[in-house]
Curated annotation (Swiss-Prot):
Keywords: ATP-binding, Ligase, Nucleotide-binding. One of its GO terms (molecular function) is glutamate-cysteine ligase activity. Pfam families: GCS2. Belongs to the glutamate--cysteine ligase type 2 family. YbdK subfamily. This is Putative glutamate--cysteine ligase 2. One of its GO terms (biological process) is modified amino acid biosynthetic process.
Amino acid sequence: MLEFNNSTPLTMGVELELQIVNRRDYNLTRGSSDLLVIIDKTDHGYDIKPEITESMIEIATSVHTDHKEMLAELTAMRTLLISAADKLNLGLAGGGAHPFQHWEDQRIYPTDRYRLVSELYGYLAKQFTVYGQHIHIGCATGDEAIRLAHMLARYIPHFITMSASSPFYQGVDTTFQSSRLTSINAFPLSGYMPFVTDWDSFNAYFDKMSSLGIVASMKDFYWDIRPKPEYGTVEIRVCDTPLSIEVAVALAGYAQTLSKFFFAQQELKPAQDTYLTYSYNRFQACRFGLNGALINPINGTQTSIKEDILQTFEMLADIAQELGTTEAIELLRQRIQAGQSDADWLRASYEKSGSLSDVVRQQSAVWMAR
């Protein structure tokens, strides 16, 4: 039986997985252990930990109600990380996938869980050297978390599109805006969670999967959105790690604003038909970004993802004003209206330099604010 630890509605937090690169050719390097040794010599109080391979490090914010306070915390965490990285002559970068690393070169970080994942999934574990942003939104009850997860599912293409930053993979332009999610698709428990409508039903599903020996904990579900009962949150897991912390925080502000809308509109109920077009819309966002198509399965209309995002921003304007997220949404709006995305920026950088090493150098400079 999973217990949902109720939390304050609309509180939020983010996790960011970061690339660790050398400063010679800007390939990934096994630097997480050394970074953590230096970082942990200071009494910082931040949540900084290793990830599945040694060329990754994860930072997680504390719980926030205001996106500006979240940005201040991430800025301080970035300063701490940069100081440690400089001592080791390492670089740190955002981006959903390193442009030219090869999965077979990666080494699993030595924890019991990561060893088990590696034994179970084989080479997929090393291919999981991709970098995402996870956004948590607090919910008062498990029932509300299940409802919110389903209501947000229709907007998953928005989060994919606005964070997309993985056009290159293993030295190749994939033609995708976000190639990262294709790595996650290979896991058997990826995609979307089943259409259960309350916490008791979700518990029954989890107990059944557990009794069949398929899962041992919620960590075994790699869904795009999932409840996080120990935190009392809904977790959005589709975002590539943006190139800057400012965009990461703006995305969290957008998630908070959408969630407030759904908390206020309790008469809106989850619709199972949302999932008829879920995989199609998700693919369109990964492949084409703002130019992708989005089909509404309820009324059968089709629009561009760009137009759907901008219409949603308009719908949320009053709520954003009330919540204090207008500035966050305006940052996203300006990028969209200008046709800007991190994926396009990375491609433009490659067109200018002709060197993926130089692309990583530039994206590292962006994240490290240099």
